[in-house]
Amino acid sequence: MSTIKIKQVKSRIGAPADQKRVLDALGLRKMNRVVEHEATPSILGMVEKVKHLVAIVK
């Protein structure tokens, strides 16, 4: 599998609890932090749930 880099670009303040849990599971706790994960279906599904808060970095 390939890896993807995910960056949190918007604040989690005001986001529903389930979206905050997804950010925690991805390892994103602060703005502008970048994490690297394998591009598995579960990770891509989590990114889809919080796509308005994160960006995929090339």
From Swiss-Prot:
Q: Which UniProt keywords apply?
A: Ribonucleoprotein, Ribosomal protein
Asked if the Swiss-Prot or TrEMBL record annotates the protein with the keyword Glycoprotein, the reply is: no
> What's an example GO BP annotation here?
translation
An annotated GO cellular component: cytosolic large ribosomal subunit
Instruction: List, in alphabetical order, the Gene Ontology terms for molecular function in this entry.
Output: structural constituent of ribosome
Q: Which InterPro entries match?
A: Ribo_uL30_ferredoxin-like_sf (IPR036919), Ribosomal_uL30_bac-type (IPR005996), Ribosomal_uL30_ferredoxin-like (IPR016082)
Regions that span the bilayer: none
The record's listing under CDD domains reads: Ribosomal_L30
Task: Indicate whether Ribosomal protein appears among the record's keywords.
Answer: yes
Q: Name one Pfam family in it.
A: Ribosomal_L30
Superkingdom, according to UniProt?
Bacteria
Subunit organization = Part of the 50S ribosomal subunit.
User: Can you tell me which family this protein belongs to?
Assistant: Belongs to the universal ribosomal protein uL30 family.
Q: What is this protein called?
A: Large ribosomal subunit protein uL30
Encoding gene (name): rpmD
